């Protein structure tokens, strides 16, 4: 018998949002506007803090590469922003090299996310960027809210970035529908303990009254191990899931509309 679901936890990339959005819209926006952003914001406390955090990360990487054999980060040097003798243009060039290097290597460091978050906020507010969700997502959110089903987001993107995407979506602000957000500060998405922490934080009944929807079979496996109901999002453009045997042990949908035929949403 299918249990009643009263809490839905959603991934973003490949689930609520085309997986291409981040790589085709958000990341290119950073690359295209990084020089302008740094020059326009130069001297602001926000940018000073962003650069300080990037510099601290560079020092940590440099120290780690010296201490650990064959663990060379090769992170490009950032000049000391607190050294008054540092040439402004050379400092800017070093920051740009470092940021682009991290993005080229798909690094998800906290300082990089912080800078990106500030840039995306500016982009969204000035309508240079608009969040994208699949067409049926707003209706699903509305249906869940009407039936008193709580909606949470759990994504590797920062909570700030999550809120921007849903607040400035192509269907208007969807934030009022969402009760809460989680990112990797609560734990990695491949670890069952992360989902257990989320359950403990929400604290709204037994694990089998929750549904987690994701496009990642490894995330699905981790969530299931923590007791959640899980459904895989199989969307056009998502990376193919190679392990067909494991895939077939999960419910699968290609649209949120299909979730309402597979699960009982009742609170």
From Swiss-Prot:
Q: Which UniProt keywords apply?
A: Amino-acid biosynthesis, Cytoplasm, Hydrolase, Magnesium, Metal-binding, Methionine biosynthesis, Nucleus
Q: Which residues form the signal peptide?
A: none
The UniProt note on the cofactor reads as follows:
Binds 1 Mg(2+) ion per subunit.
State any GO CC term: nucleus
Annotated Gene Ontology MF terms?
A: acireductone synthase activity; magnesium ion binding
Which SUPFAM superfamilies does this entry report, sorted A to Z? Answer: HAD-like (SSF56784)
Presence of keyword Cytoplasm: yes
**Main enzyme class:** hydrolase
UniProt-annotated location(s): Cytoplasm; Nucleus
Residues the entry annotates as binding Mg(2+): 11, 13, 215
Q: Name any Gene Ontology BP term.
A: L-methionine salvage from methylthioadenosine
What is known about its subunit structure?
Monomer.
> To which protein family does this belong?
Belongs to the HAD-like hydrolase superfamily. MasA/MtnC family.
What is the protein name given in its UniProt record? Enolase-phosphatase E1
> What organism does this protein naturally occur in?
Dictyostelium discoideum (Social amoeba)
Recorded name of the encoding gene: enoph1
């Amino acid at each position: 018998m299918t249990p009643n679901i009263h809490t839905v936890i959603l991934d973003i990339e490949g689930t609520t949002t085309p997986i291409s959005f981040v790589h085709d819209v958000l990341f290119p926006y950073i690359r295209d506007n990084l020089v302008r952003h740094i020059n326009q914001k130069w001297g602001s406390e926000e940018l000073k803090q962003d650069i300080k955090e990037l510099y601290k990360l560079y020092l940590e990487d440099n120290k780690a590469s010296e201490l650990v054999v064959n663990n060379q980060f090769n992170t490009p040097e950032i000049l000391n922003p607190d050294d008054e003798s540092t040439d402004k243009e050379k400092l800017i060039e070093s920051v740009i090299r470092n940021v682009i290097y991290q993005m080229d290597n798909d690094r998800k460091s906290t300082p990089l996310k912080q800078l990106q978050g500030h840039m995306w906020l500016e982009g969204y507010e000035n309508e240079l960027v608009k969040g994208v969700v699949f067409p049926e997502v707003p209706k699903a959110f509305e249906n869940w809210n009407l039936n008193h089903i709580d909606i949470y987001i759990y994504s590797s993107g920062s909570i700030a970035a999550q809120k921007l995407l849903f607040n400035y979506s192509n269907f208007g602000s969807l934030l009022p529908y969402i009760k809460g957000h989680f990112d990797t500060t609560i734990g990695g998405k491949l670890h069952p303990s992360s989902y257990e922490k989320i359950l403990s934080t929400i604290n709204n009944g037994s694990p089998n009254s929750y549904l987690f929807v994701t496009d990642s079979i490894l995330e699905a496996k981790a969530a299931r191990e923590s007791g959640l109901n899980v459904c895989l999002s199989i969307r056009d453009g998502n990376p193919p899931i190679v392990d067909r045997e494991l895939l077939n042990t999960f419910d699968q949908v290609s649209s949120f509309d299909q979730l309402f035929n597979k699960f009982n949403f009742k609170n």
